[in-house]
Amino acid sequence: MKPKSKVLIIAGSDSSGGAGIQADIKTITSLGSYAMTAVTAITIQNTTGVKSIVSIEPKKILDQIIFTCKDIKPDAIKIGMLHSSNVINFVINSIDRIKVKKIILDPVMIAKGGAKLINKRAIKTLQKNLIKKITLITPNIPEAEILTNTRIKNIDDMIFAANILLKFGAKNVLVKGGHLKNKIIPDVFVSKKEIKIFRNKKITTKNTHGTGCTLSSAITTFFSCGKPLKKSCELAIKYVNHSIRSNLNYGKGHGPVNHLNSIKIKKIFR
């Protein structure tokens, strides 16, 4: 089978394979597209937490992006972990040069086990310089609270935070509601033209490592294949929900989701 599209991932590596670039590659491949990578950091972690983070020299990150895209131009880009202000600025430089229009940003800030993956200066740079460059930003509730300096307890708060991100220059926002203690989980899509709330039953499991990475990569994949952005979000949420339901009970902590689940449910993604 020939890949449907080409996706460049700019993100950190997760040695346990559940999140980061490893989750991105699995997601993109399982949905039928071709994945390329630019590694921004190496995280030494397992399902119980992050032991340490090894930074990649920003110039080497830029080189990965430019050299790869010079040969194979991606249809879309997914951006994940950018742990420093310097890294963010080099990534902005690179995406300005390669001129890809479809860019999804997952503002990775805190690992599932609670470890911080980005510093305060980088958050300011992301707010001021990067958000306006991308097509969609996909924060979870803790990330949206940090980016907007607000408290989020319900759907109205999620919409309010999304509108702040629009004022920062975001074109579209998907605030993920998985951290709410609701039986029905809302994911809120907000643009300057509309608000759409996706509602799904909460799945009770500790095995949710990599759900944010998986969702943003799934959105990027559907979007890269020509699906409208809002529809891409809807399909990606379905994919992640099925991945969680068929989760892998690996490790002693937060186990990974099952990226191979799409093989069984391809009819959903038409």
Ranges and model annotations:
Residues 2-9, 29-112, 116, 266:
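Conserved N-terminal subdomain of the carbohydrate kinase-like
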Residues 4, 55, 230-270:
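Charged C-terminal helix
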Residues 10-16, 195-209:
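Short pre-catalytic strand/loop immediately N-terminal to key active-site residues, enriched for Gly-Thr
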Residues 17-33:
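N-terminal basic/disordered segments at the start of proteins
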Residues 22-25, 146, 205-229:
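Short, small-residue alpha-helix embedded
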Residues 31-36, 222-236:
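Phosphate-handling active-site elements
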Residues 120-195:
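Conserved phosphate/ATP/ADP-binding segment of small-molecule kinases
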